[in-house]
From Swiss-Prot:
Organism: Lachnospira eligens (strain ATCC 27750 / DSM 3376 / VPI C15-48 / C15-B4) (Eubacterium eligens)
Predominant subcellular localization, coarse grouping: cytoplasm
InterPro entries: Aldolase_TIM, DeoC, DeoC/FbaB/LacD_aldolase, DeoC_typeI
Pathway assigned to this chain's UniProt record: Carbohydrate degradation; 2-deoxy-D-ribose 1-phosphate degradation; D-glyceraldehyde 3-phosphate and acetaldehyde from 2-deoxy-alpha-D-ribose 1-phosphate: step 2/2
Taxonomic path: Bacteria, Bacillati, Bacillota, Clostridia, Lachnospirales
Role, per record: Catalyzes a reversible aldol reaction between acetaldehyde and D-glyceraldehyde 3-phosphate to generate 2-deoxy-D-ribose 5-phosphate.
Keyword line: Cytoplasm, Lyase, Schiff base
Catalysed reactions, semicolon-separated: 2-deoxy-D-ribose 5-phosphate = D-glyceraldehyde 3-phosphate + acetaldehyde
The protein's name in its UniProt record: Deoxyribose-phosphate aldolase
Pfam families given in the database record: DeoC
């Protein structure tokens, strides 16, 4: 796969404006990234900005805490798809996972999966808050629910992607889904190391810097 196609060019800042999202989309078209990743309020606008390109519109759901009801996540997903989302990055209910409420976590992921049938679903764990055993369980639940990717982090908590986490997730999805690394990927060497560890997609707001660092 071409290096540029590993990237979800991302702006999830709470103060992002339409001008910021327009710039994000123009950059993504210039470099032909896999997608732009935006908050739901900009789904339709990003889709419009990307018209005529191969760049996908990726939208976050239940972001960044994952701590709202499953019904709300399902509706948010349905609305994003109606507005033009090609890919959904959802956050699991981290507290329920840590409490061992695995059926509830599965149902949460499955509800979003059903709401974006035919679209790409990435499931965000927030690994900095989890033990290795919890990360492994989250992989199992995500695969069972039909996720296309498992994802390390939101980038909004206490830590981001690590090489060891990417390798752990890659091993425990057993080829049944892909791995996205996100959070703290800010230079070419880090991006390359994540890919070497098994990442199939990278989420970062430093994408242009990474591409320039490769040259």
């Amino acid at each position: 796969m071409k290096f540029n196609k590993y990237f979800d060019h991302t702006n999830l800042k709470p103060d992002a404006t339409k001008d910021d999202i327009r710039t994000l989309c123009e950059e993504a078209k210039k470099y032909d990234f896999a997608s732009v990743c935006v908050n739901g309020i900009y789904t339709a606008f990003a889709k419009q900005c990307l018209s005529g390109s191969d760049v996908k519109t990726c939208v976050v759901v239940g972001f960044p805490l994952g701590a709202m009801s499953t019904d709300v996540k399902a509706y948010e997903t349905k609305k994003a798809v109606e507005d033009g989302a090609d890919e959904i990055d959802m956050v699991i209910p981290v507290g329920l996972l840590k409490a061992g409420e695995y059926d509830a976590v599965y149902e949460d992921i499955k509800a979003v999966r059903d709401a974006c049938a035919g679209k790409v679903l990435k499931v965000i764990f927030e690994n900095c808050l989890l033990t290795d055993e919890e990360k492994i369980k989250a992989c199992e639940l995500s695969v069972k629910a039909g996720a296309d990717y498992v994802k390390t982090s939101t980038g909004f908590s206490t830590g981001g992607a690590t090489i060891s986490d990417v390798a752990l997730m890659k091993a425990h999805v057993e080829g049944k889904c892909k791995v996205k690394a996100a959070g703290g990927i800010r230079d070419y060497n880090t991006a390359a190391a994540m890919i070497d560890a098994g990442a199939d997609r990278l989420g970062t707001s430093a994408t242009i810097k990474i591409m320039e660092g490769r040259q």
